[in-house]
A protein has these predicted regions:
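Glycine-rich, flexible N-terminal cofactor/catalytic loop recognition
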Residues: 1-47
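Cysteine-dependent PTP/DSP-like catalytic domain, specifically the C-terminal lobe
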Residues: 102, 111-138
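Catalytic cysteine-centered active loop of the rhodanese-like fold, especially the PTP/DSP P-loop
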Residues: 79-108, 112
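Adenosine ribonucleotide-centric catalytic and binding domains
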Residues: 41-52, 112, 126
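Helix-loop module immediately N-terminal to the HCX5R catalytic loop
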Residues: 50-87
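Short, solvent-exposed loop/turn segments at secondary-structure junctions
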Residues: 30-33, 55-57, 93-95
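Short amphipathic alpha-helical surface patches that serve as generic macromolecular interface elements
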Residues: 69, 73, 98-101, 128
Length: 138
């Protein structure tokens, strides 16, 4: 499974360049920030963008909700066989996005070491558990 974790700035740069891979983007931003700064088109390869906002915390009241975790899993399940790549991004590309990416990898490949063994990432464990739980409840 080809999955990349990016910061918001890296995702913006990616969207402005041509790519041949059909890509699903999971876009995580802070509450209150701009949502529609990425666009998909035939040139950049982005076929679907799942947009959501939640804080980078383990507080159930402000972090990822069960409904958001379910939306991620449903979109990944629906588009995985039609996509060449999944990009997960958050503001810094280190915590929330890493938690989501690790959960996707764990569910589909049973191997999340690509994320957990990389010192660049500090996955948000609450996000990881919520998304993994949503996958198991599908």
């Amino acid at each position: 499974m080809n999955i990349e974790v990016m910061s918001r700035q890296m995702a913006k740069r990616y969207a402005y360049k041509p790519h041949s891979e059909k890509t699903l983007v999971i876009s995580i931003t802070d509450p209150g920030s701009e949502l529609n700064y990425l666009e998909g088109n035939k040139d950049n390869g982005i076929r679907k963008i799942v947009r959501m906002q939640f804080e980078d915390t383990d507080n159930p009241n402000t972090s990822i909700s069960p409904a958001q975790a379910k939306e991620i899993t449903e979109q990944v399940a629906q588009f995985t066989e039609h996509m060449d790549k999944i990009i997960v991004h958050c503001e810094a590309g280190q915590s929330r996005s890493a938690g989501v990416a690790a959960a996707i990898l764990k569910f589909y490949t049973n191997d999340d070491t690509q994320i957990f063994d990389n010192p660049r990432y500090t996955p948000n464990m609450y996000v990881y558990r919520m998304v993994l739980e949503a996958f198991h409840n599908m």
